[in-house]
Amino acid sequence: MLKNKHLLDPSDFTIEEFDEIFKLAHQIMANPKEYQNICNGKILATLFYEPSTRTRLSFESAMLRLGGQVIGFSEPNSSSVSKGESLRDTIKTVNCYADLIAMRHPLEGAAKVASMYSDIPVINAGDGGHQHPTQTLTDLLTIKEYKGNLEGNTIALCGDLKFGRTVHSLIKALSRYKNNKFILISPIELRIPNYIREQILEKNNIEYKEITSLEEGIKEANILYMTRIQRERFVDQSEYERLKDVYVLDEAKMKGAKEDMMVLHPLPRVNEISYEVDEDSRAFYFKQAKCGMYVRMALMAKLLGEA
């Protein structure tokens, strides 16, 4: 039973619970009208302390399509946070108004702190450079729907692997499925954090390699996960300018990829995937965004005990 659980990290749920969510998401995709009122009378609070378009709108659309309602803020300056209110007090107050919280925060561990003061489920919609579990559910559902299997894949992850919370969450989740291999493509400065390398990959004897060449990595992968170099994570903007265009996936590079390779991206993109790739049948990132809405519908319905 997922009712009243928090989702702060992919490891909070078992593989069986993932499958439960994916099964419901698939059913909703196939017959959305059947689920359009199951959360009637329920309220989602979206507390976004960091800018977001896709994740916030995906959560809001998901709740509205389930028949529920949405309250919240999209930047801290429009809330009592700007007056100095603590996270603890914000969460305890929102508990009086809502049935469920989706929260994004720039500080790692903020969602965990929020859950300590909440009697209603808290969903981590991204905490700094740490984790982004609903993006992971989105990624897994997309792979499952279009590849058919979450096991036995060679996944190349490219770009900002140091600060990229979507990358950290995805590695953590896919490492729980059998025979997956990882190719980690990044500049030396943006390599995967040690805790991911040591506590997840090496501890579980998962095959991986770290390289700097996208052209080399793309040859072996059947899933390519592109990420942007994140301007907001850099203190030194000259360093960002130096690294921002180091990886650009274009039509020429796609010619070196497998015919059945899947290209994913958590979005937003900047320059790392050229628009010409959008027309390639291997580009799945907009289908991925749609899967995100359905998987959030399934997740919220489960946490609220409505499905």
UniProtKB/Swiss-Prot annotation:
Metabolic or biological pathway, per its Swiss-Prot or TrEMBL entry: Pyrimidine metabolism; UMP biosynthesis via de novo pathway; (S)-dihydroorotate from bicarbonate: step 2/3
Binding site residues for L-aspartate: 83, 165, 228
Pfam family, one: OTCace
Catalyzed reaction equations: carbamoyl phosphate + L-aspartate = N-carbamoyl-L-aspartate + phosphate + H(+)
Binding site for carbamoyl phosphate: 54-55, 104, 132, 135, 267-268
One record GO biological process: 'de novo' pyrimidine nucleobase biosynthetic process
Keyword Transferase among UniProt keywords: yes
Molecular function via GO: amino acid binding; aspartate carbamoyltransferase activity
Annotated InterPro entries: Asp/Orn_carbamoyltranf_P-bd (IPR006132), Asp/Orn_carbamoylTrfase (IPR006130), Asp/Orn_carbamoylTrfase_sf (IPR036901), Asp_carbamoyltransf (IPR002082), Asp_carbamoyltransf_Asp/Orn-bd (IPR006131)
Keywords noted in UniProt: Pyrimidine biosynthesis, Transferase
Enzyme's top EC category: transferase
Its EC number(s): 2.1.3.2
Description of how the protein assembles with itself and partners: Heterododecamer (2C3:3R2) of six catalytic PyrB chains organized as two trimers (C3), and six regulatory PyrI chains organized as three dimers (R2).
Described function: Catalyzes the condensation of carbamoyl phosphate and aspartate to form carbamoyl aspartate and inorganic phosphate, the committed step in the de novo pyrimidine nucleotide biosynthesis pathway.
Family to which this protein belongs: Belongs to the aspartate/ornithine carbamoyltransferase superfamily. ATCase family.
Protein name in UniProt: Aspartate carbamoyltransferase catalytic subunit
